[in-house]
Design a protein with these regions (language model features):
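A eukaryote-biased signal for short, well-structured alpha-helical docking elements
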Residues: 33-52, 349-380
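Repeat-solenoid scaffold signature
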Residues: 346-369, 381-388, 396-413, 707-710, ...
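Bacterial N-terminal signal peptides that target proteins for export
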Residues: 2-11
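Extracellular low-complexity, Gly/Ser/Thr-rich intrinsically disordered linkers
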Residues: 310-346, 624, 628-659, 666-730
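Low-complexity, acidic Ser/Thr/Pro/Gly-rich terminal tails and inter-domain linkers that flank the onset
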Residues: 50-68, 373-396
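Collagen/collagen-like triple-helix sequence repeat recognition
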Residues: 11, 15-56
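Extended surface/linker regions that mediate inter-domain or inter-protein docking
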Residues: 57, 68-320, 398-664
């Protein structure tokens, strides 16, 4: 029988291969000729170099050049991180990439020599089409306008054809005038990370060059930083950072929908007037007129800013002389009436019933006014001195001393030329233990008619009016006992005062003619008082040759004067507030919380209006940055910081036991604990307070226990870590 079983496939293939090989001679013939070369392929895309912009911690923008041809502007710019590494990947198709371009030109106002920036690409802001704001070319509206060169350099071509462009506000592009291109970027990622940057480029399109450009540089942003900080000046959600970008947008053509000018000069003057901005209404009645503009959520009134500088009308606070400012003196040489109305409103109180005729400006009548002279009395007072001599302790344990006020020529100032009105008394404040934060506020006895103690009421004596002083031929003879509101206050002088540091601090004003350095009687019409800036008298009575110990460095006085200028809120002679506002000074009512608050210098510095406008910071100061006010000096082992903890053991700081309670008891905190509580008391949890107490801090009703506390805060909370906790670095 025939076997019909199928053989495996591999056996069949092997058999076929064997037959094929048997038919080969072993020679495969000559190699064929080489084929013709193939057609070269297209070049590949260049690779990127640098860092993708979405991976960057920060971005620095710089416009490297611009050109104009046929009505179109082409812009070259770079993006890099702070190390100079190029940032590629900017794209109008990326929803996180909010990137904008604006244009403005510098031109003279019609009928005026005043040169002003006028924005282009303007948009209307009301239905009538009569008010305008600066418009932008947004990258997301024209992604194809951008070329990314892959290395952090970019080219952007404006889509607007300026040769036939009709601006909504009627501004006519002139290629022969100075133009400003500005960049605004603000990337806000879902992670919370943000990139924000500005850049600008001034040039003349007709020549495609920067030679011969016009300027309008009146102030520097660094001057603003004297009071403000960079983060507090980030406008419009952090998009606007540079002065040049502010100028481009807040220019001579823009206003809110109601026609209120938001031109930079007008706006800045008006905002800083705050609640002091007043004018006349239609009936001729003086009324508050805080600067009010229509915003995204309705009208916004700037009735809260507190301009801290004295004298108030000292223009040089902002218009600081700076050789790098091309137009630093323009504000005097060519005053802008729009800036005038920023302070004085369109209906100045000083005008009364007078109405400015059509076509006239402020400078037509007031062109010769020199506001720089408003500081003349203060400048003069800086040259005055207060001499203290014949300091003695009486058998009754009172201190007596003589005081003479001298001008810069050594001439005595008379009693009639020394100012006294309201809270302004010509005080001599007596203190001891200066290096230990001044005397504690204690009342030894009070029988209703006489009180003996060391409170600031017991330690300050007026040269006029409280019975402590006798004036004789230019010299005031002072005894440390006075009468106030019918009660006699006697200072309790320490028995060992001869070996303690003694300070007698003069806090007084001298009267001058208005806007003048000429001294005058304080009853004269328009007499202007200015504080004498003179060092306090310090000594050790038992050893007048000894070196008098100083209070540790805490605050940088220069920063205080930089913002406040010649005068603080009151009683101003240097940064000596603690002479009265000691750590344990009595509490007072607090309208903000409805309860009580501390009145110590530390608390006031941390929480004063303008220093603190809410938890976590303020609109003026970045309060979380301790270096805003505190000192930093070179020490043996590096920098010594004025906010370092652990330097002031033995003190008791008065605080309310509970925030918001008008009947709260006075409790006391140890020094480092008080520093934290001056800002954070309202927000301290039980766990946080337990942590403080667990590390030696004290907060309770017993003053002696606060003084005896042995705090260990500084062990962990170094200045570097304190700054880190608040989001900053040293």
């Amino acid at each position: 029988m025939m076997d019909t079983k199928k053989k495996p496939l591999w056996i069949l293939l092997a058999s076929a291969l064997a037959v094929g090989m048997a038919g080969c001679s072993g020679d495969d013939g000559k190699d064929g000729a080489d084929g013709a070369p193939g057609t070269p392929g297209e070049d590949g895309q260049p690779g990127t170099s640098g860092l993708h912009i979405d991976m960057a911690e920060e971005a620095v923008a710089q416009i490297s050049g611009a050109s104009y041809a046929g009505g179109t502007i082409t812009l070259e710019f770079d993006l890099a991180n702070r190390q100079g590494v190029g940032l590629f990947g900017l794209s109008g198709e990326n929803p996180d990439h909010d990137f904008r371009f604006s244009l403005a030109q510098l031109q003279q106002e019609e009928g005026s020599e005043l040169k002003q920036w006028f924005s282009l690409l303007n948009e209307t802001t009301n239905e009538a089409g009569t008010t305008f704001e600066q418009g932008f070319e947004k990258l997301k509206d024209c992604p194809e306008c951008l070329t990314d060169h892959g290395d952090g350099t970019y080219t952007y071509t404006f889509k607007t054809d300026l040769s036939g462009y009709e601006d909504a506000a009627g501004v006519v592009f002139d290629e022969a005038l100075t133009q400003r291109i500005a960049i605004e970027m603000q990337f806000e990622y879902a992670s919370g990370h943000e990139l924000a940057e500005n850049a600008h480029y001034d040039w003349i399109p007709a020549t495609n060059a920067q030679q011969g450009i016009g300027t309008r540089d009146l102030v520097t942003l660094e001057t603003c930083y004297t009071c403000h900080q960079s983060d507090s000046l980030k406008a419009h959600g952090g998009r606007r950072l540079d002065m040049e970008n502010c100028q481009s947008c807040h220019n001579g053509v823009v206003s809110d929908p109601n026609g209120v000018s938001v031109e930079l000069g007008h706006m800045i003057h008006a905002i800083h007037m705050g609640p002091s901005r007043v004018g006349l209404d239609d009936t001729g009645t003086e009324v508050p007129m805080p600067y009010t503009v229509e915003g995204y959520h309705g009208p916004h009134a700037f009735d809260y800013p507190a301009f801290p500088t004295k004298p108030f009308m000292d223009c040089t606070v902002c218009h600081v002389a700076d050789e790098n400012l091309a137009d630093g003196e323009l504000w005097m040489a060519n005053a802008n009436g729009n800036a005038c109305t920023g302070c004085h409103t369109d209906r100045p109180v000083q005008h009364g019933s007078f109405t400015v005729p059509e076509g006239m400006s402020c400078t037509d009548c007031h062109g010769s006014v020199d506001h720089t002279q408003s500081r003349a009395p203060y400048e003069a007072a800086k040259g005055y001195s207060v001499e203290v001599f014949n300091v003695m302790v009486t058998p009754e344990n009172l201190l007596t001393f003589d005081v003479e006020v001298l001008d810069d020529q050594g001439n005595a100032v008379t009693e009639e030329e020394i100012y006294q009105q309201g809270y302004s008394n010509p005080y001599m404040v007596v203190s001891w233990d200066v290096e230990k934060d001044y005397p504690a506020q204690e009342v030894l006895s009070d029988d209703g008619t006489t009180t003996i103690g060391t409170t600031y009421d017991h330690r300050r004596f007026s040269l006029k009016g409280d019975g402590s002083s006798v004036y004789d031929n230019g010299v005031f003879h002072v005894t440390t006992s006075k009468v106030k509101s019918g009660k006699t206050y006697v200072m309790d002088l320490p028995a060992d005062i001869a070996i303690r540091t003694l300070e007698i601090l003069p806090v007084l004003k001298v009267c001058f003619e208005p806007h003048s350095a000429v001294r005058t009687d304080c009853t004269s019409e328009g007499a202007y008082p200015a504080y004498v800036q003179t060092p306090g008298y310090r000594t050790i009575l038992g050893d007048t040759d000894a070196t008098v110990a100083q209070r540790r460095a805490i605050v940088d006085d220069g920063k205080c004067f930089g913002c406040h200028s010649m005068e603080f809120y009151h009683d101003s002679n240097g940064v000596n507030c603690i002479a009265c506002h000691t750590n344990d000074k009595t509490l007072k009512s607090d309208s903000a919380s409805g309860g009580l608050k501390s009145t110590s210098f530390m608390y006031k510095a941390h929480k004063a209006q303008g220093h603190d406008n809410g938890h976590g910071g303020s609109g003026t100061l970045l309060k979380t940055d301790c270096t805003t006010c505190h000192s930093a000096t070179e020490g043996w082992g590096g920098m010594d910081y004025g906010f370092a903890l652990g330097r002031n053991a033995g003190q008791a700081h008065a605080l309310p036991a509970k925030i918001g309670d008008p009947d709260a008891a006075t409790w006391y905190a140890s020094s480092d604990t008080a520093a934290c509580m001056s800002c954070h008391q309202k927000y301290l949890s039980d766990a946080a307070m337990a942590h403080i107490r667990g590390n030696g801090g004290y907060f309770g009703a017993v003053k002696a226990d606060a003084k005896a506390a042995q705090e260990a805060c500084a062990t962990c909370h170094s200045p570097q870590k304190v700054m880190g906790h608040h989001g900053h670095e040293l």
